[in-house]
């Protein structure tokens, strides 16, 4: 059986922490920001931790990636 390949798009978008949590950048700050307040755009900065169900799906896509 061949080696399992990890999903390249998922590798670029998500990160698994040492404790096993999955983090991702917050959505909604790429474009159409002119009408959003500074408070909203600041809140959308940084990373967020995925829920347990979403994290499980991401980990399945990263299964072939070493160290994940």
From Swiss-Prot:
> What is this protein's record name?
Large ribosomal subunit protein bL35
Keyword Lipid metabolism listed: no
Protein family per UniProt: Belongs to the bacterial ribosomal protein bL35 family.
Q: Which GO terms describe its biological process?
A: translation
Any single GO molecular-function term of the entry would be: structural constituent of ribosome
Which NCBIfam families does this UniProt record tie to the protein?
rpmI_bact (TIGR00001)
Highest rank taxon of the organism: Bacteria
Bias-annotated ranges (Basic residues): 1-15, 23-38
Map out region (Disordered) in residue numbers: 1-38
Keyword line = Ribonucleoprotein, Ribosomal protein
Q: Which GO terms describe its cellular component?
A: cytosolic large ribosomal subunit
Q: Which gene name does the record give?
A: rpmI
Q: Does the keyword Disulfide bond apply?
A: no
Q: Which InterPro entries match?
A: Ribosomal_bL35, Ribosomal_bL35-like, Ribosomal_bL35_sf
């Amino acid at each position: 059986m061949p080696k399992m390949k990890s999903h390249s798009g998922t590798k670029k978008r998500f990160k698994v922490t040492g404790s096993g949590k999955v983090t991702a950048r917050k959505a909604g700050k790429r474009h159409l920001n002119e009408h959003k307040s500074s408070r909203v755009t600041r809140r959308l900065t940084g990373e967020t931790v995925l829920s347990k169900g979403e994290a499980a799906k991401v980990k399945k896509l990263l299964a072939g990636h070493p160290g994940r």
